């Protein structure tokens, strides 16, 4: 079992727990500007990332002040701030996402391993303007469903691909923002 398989298995357990406890509702002001609008006509666009740890690198910045880091990214001209919210493998949290979203005026990406609609609901109530869908982690039907659901909920989607076959899958669902990893 590779790391992506282990992460997805952990996410299945987390989703079951989320469905039992539900997603808290947080009143949010209007959504941040559209990422597509921010990318249009830009010579250079930067997605700056807040990442406490990773499975491959271990601890990176466990004690990072996410608000200070996000404000520094915004001041430096970042187009989007990506916040890792996976707790088990990346040591992030929804609290990190909410704190960053409340502190900046640019779009915030919830970077997690989305496998269920309830995770999209949770990202939205914590201030995400866009979410990440990883083609390699999803069957085509679920990829299409989560993509459509996120847009129906007023969010944008960054679809991550690793090769040409995944790019074709992303194009098949009409992905408007595609990232190559």
Regions found by a protein language model. Give the residues of each.
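Short acidic catalytic loops
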Residues: 107, 112-114, 120, 131
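Catalytic-face loop-and-helix region of soluble metabolic enzyme cores
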Residues: 177-181
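A short alpha/beta connector and helix-capping loop motif
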Residues: 119-137, 143
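Conserved N-terminal beta1-alpha1 strand-loop-helix module at the mouth
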Residues: 1-108, 115, 140, 151-174
